[in-house]
């Protein structure tokens, strides 16, 4: 398979198919834009941003990217019209977005895409694990010639694969990034690697993942679950398990082929990756009055939480541990996190949503997750970042998690310092975006 085909296959595996248009449609849209440019020059309409985001719904973190960026646009660019071009907003996500952002137009067909290409002034690629919608950014650039930017991505050479991307595929991505008005990377190693690979966009800097700004809530669902399981506000911690590679092949609707190499790596590390979490749970229960909620960030983690954590705990500890058996959406999850004393585990975006609200959160990571976890160092939380492949880091996990329960006030203060730093960076990025938007005439 050609290197570019390999890269595109990986993108499609992650994001799925999105609304697209034919070459004839592109030609028609380009012609319409040319004809409408004269009228645009004399108009006084709102400027229009096309947000390319919403990659998948099997992970509440991937859901959170979009409402986070939409909230920033709502706050800092209230006079700008926003259209969302999603890959997947099923499983109730569309309803969440429409209820929270009723003024945002959601693109659902190739005709909508063609209209957006014609009528929008700026394309903003949302946060993600890489330049997920690279082909759509290329389409925008080639068919419209209008400006675009990238908001909070990781840049790596593997896209969550066990093998590196071909140099040709990386070069193609760099070419797209170089055409952007700005590229914001969500972790500093991504910025450094992009520069090393030849990326030289006019503005390149760190910016927090869009999910930090998410404000979705579902208080009724969260309160009902917590009441049912006697979990009282600020008297419990959340814990999230995770395989090194998400086993998408276990989710029927994804129809992802079994990946033997990824599964082998998962099974090789799964015990070592969860033993520190188990011990932390034991110490929390036996040394403090707090309980622990085992909860998921994606649809593969409920079973993992039971088999690797709950079922292997001593009976006296199990009595104060609640296992959530079903998946949830971002609003209910975030409402739950807001009522907790903090969160720890092997995931990234639930901690992001916590820190975005000033809730303490500890991140355990490994190389297979790319460099995204290093954002914790970028925002001043290096003491809450642990590399599971470094024995010295592993030794510090349990005592550090325990401090969330023994010194909740100190932990909250630390989280809020990081939150304020993130918010300042968000303001800077929105000012940059505002400065790059074309005048509306």
What are these regions (language model features)?
Residues 1-6:
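Short, charge-enriched, intrinsically disordered boundary segments that mark the beginning
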Residues 7, 11-14, 18-21, 30, ...:
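Active-site anion-handling motifs in enzyme catalytic cores
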């Amino acid at each position: 398979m050609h290197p570019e085909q390999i890269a595109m296959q990986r993108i499609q595996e992650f994001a799925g198919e999105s609304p697209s248009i034919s070459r004839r449609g592109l030609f028609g849209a380009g012609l319409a834009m040319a004809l409408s440019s004269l009228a645009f020059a004399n108009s006084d309409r709102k400027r229009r941003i096309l947000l390319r985001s919403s990659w998948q719904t099997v992970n509440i973190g991937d859901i959170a990217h979009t409402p986070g960026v939409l909230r920033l646009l709502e706050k800092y660019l209230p006079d700008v019209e926003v259209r969302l071009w999603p890959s997947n907003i099923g499983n109730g996500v569309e309803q969440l977005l429409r209820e929270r952002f009723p003024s945002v137009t959601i693109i659902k067909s190739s005709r909508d895409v063609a209209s957006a290409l014609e009528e929008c002034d700026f394309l903003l690629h949302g946060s993600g694990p890489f330049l997920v919608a690279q082909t759509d950014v290329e389409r925008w650039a080639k068919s419209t010639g209008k400006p675009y930017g990238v908001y909070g991505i990781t840049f790596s050479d593997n896209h969550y694969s066990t093998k590196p991307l071909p140099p040709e595929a990386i070069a193609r991505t760099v070419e797209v990034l170089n055409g952007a008005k700005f590229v914001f990377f969500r972790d500093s190693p991504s910025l450094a690697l992009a520069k090393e690979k030849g990326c030289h966009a006019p503005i390149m800097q760190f910016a927090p993942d869009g999910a930090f700004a998410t404000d979705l809530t579902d208080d009724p669902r969260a309160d009902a679950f917590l009441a049912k399981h006697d979990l009282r506000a600020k008297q419990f911690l959340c814990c999230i398990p995770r395989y090194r590679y998400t086993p998408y092949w276990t989710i029927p609707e994804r129809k992802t082929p079994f990946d033997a190499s990824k599964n082998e790596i998962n099974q090789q590390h799964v015990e070592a990756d969860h033993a520190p979490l188990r011990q932390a749970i034991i110490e929390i229960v036996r040394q403090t009055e707090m309980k622990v909620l085992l909860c998921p960030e994606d649809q593969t983690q409920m079973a993992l939480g039971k088999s690797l954590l709950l079922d292997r705990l001593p009976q006296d500890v199990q009595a104060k541990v609640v296992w959530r058996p079903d998946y949830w959406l971002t609003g209910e999850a975030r409402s739950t996190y807001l009522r907790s004393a903090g969160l720890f585990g092997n995931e990234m975006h639930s901690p992001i949503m916590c820190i975005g609200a000033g809730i303490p959160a500890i991140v355990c990571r490994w190389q297979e997750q790319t460099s995204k976890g290093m954002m914790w160092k970028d925002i001043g939380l290096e003491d809450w970042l642990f590399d599971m492949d470094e024995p010295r880091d592993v030794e510090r996990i349990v005592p550090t998690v325990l401090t969330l329960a023994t010194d909740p006030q100190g932990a909250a203060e630390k989280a809020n310092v990081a939150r304020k730093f993130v918010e300042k960076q968000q303001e800077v990025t929105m000012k940059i975006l505002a400065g790059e938007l074309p005048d509306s005439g």
